[in-house]
Every structure is written in structure tokens, then in C-alpha cells.
């Protein structure tokens, strides 16, 4: 999963 996915 992408790094900018803040726990979404």
C-alpha cells in the first residue's frame, strides 16, 4: 500500500 495512505 502507498506511503501516503495514512491508515485509510
UniProtKB/Swiss-Prot annotation:
Gene Ontology cellular-component terms listed: extracellular region
Compartments it resides in: Secreted
Assigned keywords, A-Z: Amidation, Neuropeptide, Secreted
GO process annotations (BP): neuropeptide signaling pathway
Chief subcellular location: secreted
Record's keyword annotation contains Secreted: yes
Tissue expression summary: In larvae, detected in midgut but not in the CNS, ring gland, abdominal perisympathetic organs (aPSO) or thoracic perisympathetic organs (tPSO) (at protein level). In adults, expressed in brain, and thoracic-abdominal ganglion but not in corpora cardiaca and corpora allata (at protein level).
Entry-annotated residues carrying Leucine amide: 8
Protein family per UniProt: Belongs to the allatostatin family.
Record's function text: May act as a neurotransmitter or neuromodulator.
Protein name according to UniProt: Allatostatin-A4
Amino acid at each position: 500500500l502507498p506511503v501516503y495512505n495514512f491508515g485509510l
